[in-house]
């Protein structure tokens, strides 16, 4: 299912262009749309990518006779949501189902695994000071392992999953603060996790956005106001959709995976366990 060496051919596709999408989908049996953004940039707006882009892929897939479509959305997708991100995700879902009623919609929570942009990002931040600042410290998340998510996508792409919307989350939920403490325990660092109040975060985000705009994109956009709105809402399943249990997939706990890829952020890296063992021998 993951593709043997030499059997995967990467091709360019601009999901804002009908001809590009049609060329990519021509002759396909299934399509999996994983395209999504967390921040808007130029013409790559939430609507352009997550709503209109999803509509274009589904419409052309139907026209090309593609049998199965899997569309990645996100837990919290809501046409009346507080963030542009969540509303664009919901709009994309609606368009996909309009053109491909038999599509499988996957709504994951925060995804973790090697090279993820969640635990890796904050583990890297923890290297540079005694304080780890976060926005939405008490917001609940239920992280899902990337391999479990991939297994769900395979079932959808091969027609082994029933059509519908699946909210996919791991076996454990925790607050943002709790997840950071788990991560710090894995990388063996002691840091003070400080929750930034929402009103302060909104001011910070507005400042970042202004700086980004005035420098024509040179200044980094560390936080946006839309992300602050997203971080004010729990990111856990509603219980109103299908789930991993309907796919027969047993979910993976964070503790069994995090240490496999976060060890480079330990003070002694790969030698941390050896040093700890040697210290115990001396005592």
Q: Which residues make up each language-model segment?
A:
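Conserved beta-loop-beta element that borders a ligand/cofactor-binding pocket
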Residues: 73, 93-120, 124
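Substrate-positioning beta->alpha
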Residues: 56, 117-118, 136-158, 164-167, ...
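Short alpha-helix in the Rossmann-fold core of NAD(P)-dependent oxidoreductases
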Residues: 47-54, 70, 89, 142
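A hydrophobic C-terminal alpha-helical subdomain
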Residues: 199-283
């Amino acid at each position: 299912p993951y593709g043997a060496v030499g059997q995967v051919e990467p091709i360019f596709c601009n999901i804002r262009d009908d001809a590009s999408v049609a060329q990519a989908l021509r002759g396909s049996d299934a399509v999996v749309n994983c395209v999504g953004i967390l921040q808007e940039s130029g013409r790559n707006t939430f609507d352009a990518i997550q709503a209109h882009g999803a509509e274009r892929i589904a419409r052309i897939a139907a026209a090309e006779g593609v049998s199965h479509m899997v569309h990645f959305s996100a837990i919290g997708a809501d046409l009346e949501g507080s963030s542009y991100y969540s509303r664009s995700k919901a709009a994309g879902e609606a368009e996909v189902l309009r053109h491909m009623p038999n599509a499988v919609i996957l709504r994951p929570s925060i995804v973790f695994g090697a090279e993820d942009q969640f635990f890796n990002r904050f583990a890297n931040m923890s290297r540079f000071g005694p304080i780890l600042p976060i926005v939405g410290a008490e917001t609940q998340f239920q992280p899902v392992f990337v391999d479990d998510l991939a297994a769900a996508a395979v079932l959808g792409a091969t027609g082994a999953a029933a059509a519908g919307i699946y909210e996919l989350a791991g076996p454990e939920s925790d607050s943002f603060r709790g997840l950071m403490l788990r991560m710090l325990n894995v990388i063996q660092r002691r840091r003070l996790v400080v929750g930034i109040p929402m009103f302060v975060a909104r001011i910070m985000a507005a400042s970042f956005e202004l700086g980004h705009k005035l420098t024509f994109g040179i200044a980094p956009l560390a936080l946006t106001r839309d992300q602050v709105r997203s971080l004010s809402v729990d990111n856990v399943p509603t219980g109103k959709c299908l789930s991993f249990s309907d796919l027969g997939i047993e979910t993976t706990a964070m503790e069994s995976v995090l240490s496999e890829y976060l060890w480079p952020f330990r003070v002694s890296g790969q030698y941390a366990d050896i040093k700890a063992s040697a210290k115990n021998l001396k005592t």
